[in-house]
């Protein structure tokens, strides 16, 4: 029988033991994995998870569930410890790891997670109940091609107030997906707002096709057209 001493012998000085993570998303081998604390994200995603599906380019991993944060590819060597993950703006949380490839729109991903936390708000405090709703409205406008100058600053302002004023952990962490995507993928927000362009090709309202003179009117393309 191995007790607490054996468990504490694994991991790092500040983050001892092991942690179970749920690998999901654009990963070749998803599922539940138990790893010693201190293993890097790269080791978890590539040595255990087998890498990105269809050998696409790794873009980010969302850690900590819907109120966690997105960690970009250039931080893939970050050790999986509570303190190191916190430094990125994400959290270890319940152990969720949602992997994203180059075809993932980070603005739409932030909208998706915020929609969940907005729905889960108990409604007791105004900061969470109304603040997350206002943030979601801005994100929906941006992904629908109706972003405005000042939207990014408004998102940051609302996020700060929600984190400071919410009564419980849900509201205090709800803005994390937005804040981390703004921190690491701000250019995608700017592309959506100012260039009306979704580089990942995920936001249908920002996809535009031009019919050239070469078109014969066969309608074959209509079966594949996403808009």
Model-predicted regions and their roles:
Residues 127-133, 210-211, 220-227:
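Iron-sulfur cluster-binding cysteine motifs and their immediate structural context
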Residues 1-208:
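Redox cofactor-anchoring modules in respiratory/redox and cofactor-processing assemblies
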